[in-house]
Structures are given as C-alpha cells and as structure tokens.
C-alpha cells in the first residue's frame, strides 16, 4: 500500500493494499465475494454447496502478514471454514543503488522490499501449499491479485477456468487491450526449433525489457491508443502438477532489475535520493517452461493446440488496478478513482443489457467536478454473469443522479423506476429474496453538495429508501409507489407484501414457505444458463 498512502488512523502505521476500502468493503472482501459468487452459481445449477480452497501469499513488509490475518479474524473468516485458507509469505530482498552498493534505512538496517510475485511457485512448493491442495484433491487453480477489483466481472474468470479445464491446459492468462506506453508487460508466442520438430510456449515480456526482446510498442491502428501487443495480466489458470514440474526447471522465473527513484541511506549513514533496484521476478514467466512440441510448425488457429492459452476480453472487465493514490492530474490509470470509473462503465453496459433506461456515465472530468450521472452497486452473486443478471432485472428506469444498491442474489426487478436512492440488502445473501414489479421510488437521494467519496462508497444522502431482509426474509411489491425516504425491515422467515390502494401503502405479513424463492437455474442445450420462475413465491 505504499503508493496508496494507506495509514492506520490510530497507530499511523502503513497498511497493506488488501484493506483499501473500495465500493464499501475492503479489496480482500471483494475478492472473497467473487469466489462466493461462483460457489452460489454452482449451487444453483447443481444443487450442491462447495467451498473453494484459497491460498493467500502475503508479505512481512510493514507487518502486512499480521494485518491480513487480523483482518480475517475480525471478519470471522468471511463466514468460511478457517481450514479452507492457507497463508504463506514472500521473502524480502535487499535493495542496491546503481553502483551496486547496499541501501539502508535510517536505522542502519538493510533496505528490504518484496522480491516480486515470481517467488509464488517456489514458495508454494517449499511451504506446503501444493501438498495442501493435493490432499484436498485440487489439481487446477486460478491466480489473481487483490488490487484488481474488476477481475471477477461478468464471464472473465469463468471463461479462463472453463477453457483451461475443458481442454486440459497447463497454463492460461487473461489478456486485454494494452495502452501504448503503459507500464504493463505483454505475452508473445515463443517458437523454438527442436530436434525433430518445433516447441511452443507463452513468453511474457515486462515493459522495461521490451527493447531487449525487439518489441516495438506501437498502436494497433494508426493514431490509436491501444498497442498491437495485449496486456499480460496477473490473472492466471494453472495446472498444479505441471507447475511443480516447471519449478524444477525454473524455480524463480522472470528475474529482472527495474530501477526506480527513491530515498535511502548509504553505508555511511548519509541520506540520498537516486535510482535503486532489487532483483524482482514475475509469476507469469513460469509459462516459458510449459512447452508443447510438434513435428511441424504451428500457424494461425493451430496455435490453440498449445498447452498454454490466452483469453482476450474488454480491458475494463479484465484489469483496473488500485496501485497508487490519485494525484489530481487527470491520470486515472492504476488509481482507485480510475477503477471506479471502469466499474461505472461496466454497470452502464449491464443495465443497458437489462433494457433499463439509464443515463450515460459522465466523463472523468465532469464526474469529479459534479458527481455521477447514476450509481449502481451489486453483489457478485447476483450474477456474476451479465446474462444471468439480465434475466433478474428487466426494464425500468434509473433517473439522472439516482442510485440502486443491490446486496442480494435472489431478486426479480421488473419495470422498477428510481428517482433518488434505493438500497435492497439481504443480510444473508443465500436466503434473502425480493420481488418487485411496476414499483416506483421517489426520494431526495444523494446529497451532491456533500464531500462524497464515491469509489469508497462514502456517500451522504438527503433521503434514501432501504429494504433490509433479515435471514430468510422475502419482500414483495407490485404496482406500488414509495414516496420519500424510509426503511422496511423484513424479519427472518417472513414474507412481507407491500400493496397500494387509493394512494395508501399497507403491508401483509405472512410466514414464508421455506422452499420459496425466485429462480431455478438450468443449462440449455447451447450451454447457456437459463433462469425460470419457481412455482412457489
């Protein structure tokens, strides 16, 4: 969290990036919710609950490892079994200056920094992560970094895992368009002539060594902003036995030295500022050891026969990192503000697909001067596929400056109009349900004059209407007009029906059928997921 300037309010100590508040929760909680969304999807399709085993690599820099464990403890392990997590920590490596001399901190200790995520594989082997997965029967895994909150959007992770599993691949990476001149690496196919044939592998190349590898970073189209080389993200699919074999050939892949300016102390205790560097390594480069050998040369579509693969998706659905604090310079790349703008654009695409009338997102400049044209937040388990959400949300309007916040998975909204702000919150995401049809909410909504931090979801309201579902609460409203702010709480196990007669609201409370809900999920003959209404509601 260095570049994010994350500081503990009480101790004034630096905090890890995983605790950055984004969309009203930490980045770590957002990642866990993405995992739970896929588990919920599996449950709805197969009728069986599963728990995904998660290994987390931390760092001892600035007590990050301890703080991550404390976060899990405070969060009650996010409602998951403690034994479904495995923590291991990457080592710190010494820093040198351009003269090759050691750099020190003010206390005369060596200046140490994490040595890069390429140590992931060797550490996983040494600290028992692979053995832990093997005992649990896990052969394949997805890898992602906590500072990329859009990675779980729509179908990206499911497609990556689906291709890897269905075609028994050993390595895969999620690629997307890459801005010319950006500090992002790329991946190319490396061909080697072997005795009796040709071998192929994916070769990631970091941006700082493009010239050494003959990579000319130019736009795909004349005058375009995107490079002809895609971005090689840290969203990976891996075959664990294949990774273990690859470690024997390259235990620390992608080693490089990338100098950066910083303040340090020399061996005589003198404070200096200059270019310093550490030996880094990159986890994607393990793919260079995943070679596929063929008797003839591969070209075009035949390259899909390789054991490694890339998926290619929209950038705003693949990578939008929260690496640094926004400096007010209009450069949003790798900032929380930039990631939030991508989240809004994804939300606009989603709501448009739902045939919901919604204002277009404002330009970044207008957004930060005047606020958003709309806000839409939702729980990952609502989908996560846009094609699923579009079957739950149908039609309706989200008027200018309005907000809809859906912290719920089992919901049906049909022709719902919102002028103001509405929160629909299920305290138990797996049990709470709601069904609204031809409903209208009108209230004062967001206070746009307040110092709102939208990307943190720190928003002040003039009025807001909230529907809170306790446990297995079920809320139903049809042909109802909700005027002004307010809060409705539906008790656990109850079904609350809102009705309107002659302009007056009244409510009917009854016991909820424990088997009731909104949706039944099935696969169609064309491998699409189709939702049908349950008979009991």
Language-model-detected regions and their locations in the chain:
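Domain-scale recognition of functional cores that engage charged ligands
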Residues: 1-284
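Left-handed beta-helix
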Residues: 160-537
């Amino acid at each position: 969290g260095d570049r994010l300037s994350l500081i503990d309010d009480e101790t004034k100590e630096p905090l890890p990036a995983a605790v950055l508040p984004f969309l009203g929760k930490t980045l770590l909680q957002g990642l866990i919710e993405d995992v739970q969304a896929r588990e919920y999807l599996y449950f709805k399709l197969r009728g069986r609950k599963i728990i995904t085993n998660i290994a987390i690599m931390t760092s001892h820099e600035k007590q990050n490892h301890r703080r991550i464990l404390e976060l899990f403890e405070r969060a009650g392990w996010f409602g998951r079994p403690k034994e479904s997590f495995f923590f291991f920590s990457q080592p710190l490596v010494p820093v040198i200056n351009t003269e090759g001399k050691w750099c020190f901190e003010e206390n005369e200790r060596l200046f140490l920094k994490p040595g890069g995520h390429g140590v992931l594989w060797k550490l996983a082997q040494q600290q028992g992560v692979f053995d832990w997965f093997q005992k649990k029967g896990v052969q394949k895994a997805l890898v992602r970094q906590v500072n990329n909150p859009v990675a779980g959007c729509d179908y990206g992770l499911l497609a990556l895992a689906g291709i890897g599993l269905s075609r028994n691949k050993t390595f895969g990476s999620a690629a997307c368009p890459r801005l010319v001149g950006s500090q992002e690496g790329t991946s190319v196919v490396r061909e080697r002539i072997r005795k009796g044939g040709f071998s192929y592998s994916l070769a990631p190349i970091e941006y700082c060594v493009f010239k050494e590898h003959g990579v000319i970073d130019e736009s795909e189209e004349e005058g375009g902003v995107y490079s002809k080389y895609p971005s090689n993200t840290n969203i990976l699919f891996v075959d664990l036995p294949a990774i273990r074999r690859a470690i024997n050939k390259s235990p620390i892949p992608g080693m490089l030295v990338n100098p950066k300016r910083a303040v340090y102390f020399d061996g005589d205790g003198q404070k200096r500022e200059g270019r310093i560097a550490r030996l880094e390594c990159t986890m994607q480069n393990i793919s260079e050891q995943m070679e596929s050998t063929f008797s003839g040369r591969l070209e075009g579509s035949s390259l899909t026969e390789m054991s490694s693969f890339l998926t290619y998706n929209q950038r705003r659905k693949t990578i939008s990192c929260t690496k640094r604090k926004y400096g007010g310079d209009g450069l949003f790349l790798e900032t929380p503000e930039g990631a939030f703008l991508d989240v809004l654009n994804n939300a606009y695409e989603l709501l448009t697909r739902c045939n919901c009338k919604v204002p277009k997102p404002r330009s970044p400049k207008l957004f930060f001067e005047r606020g958003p044209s709309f806000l839409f937040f939702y729980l990952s388990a609502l989908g996560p596929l846009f094609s699923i959400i579009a079957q739950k949300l149908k039609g309706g309007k989200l008027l200018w400056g309005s907000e809809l916040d859906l912290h719920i998975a089992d919901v049906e909204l049909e022709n719902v109009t919102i002028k103001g702000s509405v929160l629909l919150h299920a305290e138990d995401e797996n049990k709470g349900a709601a069904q609204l049809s031809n409903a209208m909410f009108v209230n004062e909504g967001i206070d746009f004059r307040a110092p709102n931090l939208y990307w943190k979801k720190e928003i002040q309201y003039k009025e807001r209407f909230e529907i809170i579902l306790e446990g297995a609460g079920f809320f139903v409203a049809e042909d109802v007009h909700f005027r002004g702010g307010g809060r409705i709480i539906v008790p656990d196990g109850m079904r609350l029906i809102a009705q309107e007669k002659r302009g007056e609201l009244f409510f009917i409370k009854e016991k909820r059928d424990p088997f009731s809900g909104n949706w039944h999920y099935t696969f169609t003959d064309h491998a699409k997921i189709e939702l049908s209404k349950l008979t009991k509601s």
